[in-house]
């Protein structure tokens, strides 16, 4: 199945990643500490180390007041919290999506995400060997999308989004990138893509 296909990969070198510096509470906050106060630049809350006097707070799964952290059933507060969480996610830094294959002059860009990578890459590779100019942009991050998403998707003459569902990612991309003109290749068979079927479908798109 897609979930159990073995794929070789290199272990990341953690030394190449930027240092993560948590936002801890400061001594000045002690007398007026509110556990849900956020840094307005990134909507991240300040960390209080458990056991420190003056920084007692409770964690839980119910909706909280946007300031005090107390359980809240207020509709306006819930609406605000949903927007704050969405804004926080939108500000997460993710790497640009990379384009493989004929990145500079492809006549068709294949777009995929998740466990379909191997089959899509094989289809692209075989088509390029046959003289067809094809590229692949495989997304590892979809919320938020990489900052270069619109630039990549609008660069090529034809774009096809291949997914093992009814086109949810294609619809999401249309919503996030207005004016996007893309084709779809969708299957819901409970089985991995077949490379030959992908090549046939993509070749047909190139011939249109």
Predicted regions and their residues:
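Flexible, low-complexity linker and terminal segments
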Residues: 1-208
